[in-house]
Design a protein with these regions (language model features):
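Structured beta-strand-rich core segments of catalytic domains in phosphoester-bond hydrolases
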Residues: 47-100
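N-terminal, active-site-proximal structural segment of metallo-dependent hydrolase catalytic domains
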Residues: 1-51, 61, 66, 82
């Protein structure tokens, strides 16, 4: 049994702009087990991605057009947490933790 897993991490500097430049083509081509995105710069509901076979986890910044992260994974986690427990930092949407 093959236990190889592929992890991708990408600072997209704005996911909406990145979508215009082939993000979905690249996403589908690399077929990653875990695809982590930083600097999404989105608010909840601004974008809907149809990624069959992937669980999606988003952490949005409170400040519009600022920071934000997302993880797309083929593997369902046991638990998910957002932030690091420090309110002055957690409002930026920079951390998502998946437990397996």
């Amino acid at each position: 049994m093959d236990k190889t897993m592929k992890f991708i991490s990408w600072n997209v500097n704005g996911l909406r702009a990145c979508m215009q430049k082939g993000f979905l083509d690249f996403f589908n081509e690399v077929d990653a087990d875990f695809f982590c995105v930083q600097e999404t710069k989105l608010q909840e509901g601004q974008i809907a991605l149809d990624l069959p076979g992937y669980h999606q986890f988003w952490n949005y910044a409170e400040k519009k057009g600022y920071s934000g992260t997302a993880i797309f994974t083929k593997h369902e986690p046991l638990s998910v947490s957002y932030g690091i427990g420090i309110p002055e930092h957690d409002h930026e949407g920079r951390v998502i933790t998946l437990e397996y």
